[in-house]
Regions:
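A short acidic/small-residue loop/turn micro-motif
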Residues: 107-108, 118-125
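C-terminal domain-tail junction helix/linker
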Residues: 166-170, 192-255
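RNase H-like two-metal-ion nuclease catalytic core shared by retroviral integrases
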Residues: 60-63, 150-152, 158-162, 172-194, ...
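Mobile-element integrase/transposase regions
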Residues: 37-104, 128-133, 137-138, 143-145, ...
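Mobile genetic element proteins and their domesticated derivatives, centered on retroelements
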Residues: 4, 19, 39, 43, ...
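Conserved, non-catalytic sequence blocks in retroelement Pol enzymes and Pol-derived host proteins
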Residues: 11-13, 32, 78-80, 95-96, ...
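Basic, flexible linker segments flanking DNA-binding modules
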Residues: 1-82, 179, 235-242
Length: 255
């Protein structure tokens, strides 16, 4: 139980099935690992089950603008390498001082968060900061083989953001509707951060928010296994190539 408690402390919203697989891998050779149902019952008795807290919703996408909107280039595309498709999105983070907005860029192949930034407004400054962080991790040739996919929000369609993408020779792809399935991997990354961490904590100040997010994103990238990449961490998957093995049939169902 000590290992399970440690993981719960670092990742309070991690699902019981994933937690079981992590602990099983650590202790299976000892011969004292219970079955999944028995393990979940032990979690219940020790008060280690997941409890979801819903929060207020904040609008983060404004598609009512006159900027050019680009076509969706990734319909039915299954990435087979890292840095083939990056997906971008903005979500909110509540603090006692007020809301902050988190800009994320996630690799569609490995699900690794490769760029992020947080700020008090929805200005394009913060998505650009996340983009520049991601770009710092690749060379020019890799950038020219990359697709950047996002919703049609004004930040991603803005002249400043599009200019950076074009300067690096990156192909621009955007959703064609408000259907979250058109940007499912980005939505899933947002959802994991919120339901497994942010909904379960109180962040006192906006200044504290960045340090908290840095710790969470590091755990997400290096320690949280994903069913969409064969129960590997994003960091491990980011060093691979070839189609990833999923642990279920529907790519949008889980993460």
């Amino acid at each position: 139980m000590e290992k399970a408690q440690d993981y719960r402390q670092d990742n309070p919203g991690l699902g019981c099935a994933k937690l079981y697989l992590i602990i099983k891998e650590l202790f299976e050779e000892t011969g004292c690992m219970p079955g999944r149902d028995a393990f979940i019952e032990i979690l219940r008795k020790h008060g280690l089950m997941v409890h979801i807290r819903r929060r207020k919703h904040y609008k983060t996408t404004d598609s009512n603008h006159n900027y050019r909107k680009y076509p969706n280039l990734i319909v039915d595309l299954i990435p087979t390498r890292p840095n083939e498709v990056w997906v971008a999105d903005i979500t909110y983070v509540e603090t006692t001082e007020g809301v902050c907005y988190l800009s994320l860029i996630t690799d569609a192949y490995s699900h690794k968060i490769v760029g992020w930034a947080v700020g008090p407004t929805l200005e394009t400054t913060y998505p650009l900061e996340a983009l520049n962080m991601a770009l710092a991790s690749i060379d020019d040739e890799t950038a020219r083989r990359l697709i950047h996919h996002s919703d049609r929000g004004c930040q991603y369609c803005s002249a400043a953001y599009v200019e950076v993408l074009k300067q690096h020779g990156i192909s621009i792809s955007m959703t064609q509707s408000g259907d979250p399935l058109e940007n499912a991997i980005a939505e899933r990354a947002n959802g994991i951060l919120k339901t497994e961490w942010l909904y379960k904590m109180t962040i006192a100040t906006r200044a504290e928010c960045k340090a908290v997010l840095e710790r969470i994103i590091n755990f997400y990238n290096t320690r949280r296994p994903h069913m969409s990449i064969g129960m590997q961490t994003p960091e491990v998957a980011h060093g691979q190539s070839g189609e990833q093995r999923r642990c279920w049939k529907n790519n949008y169902a889980m993460g």
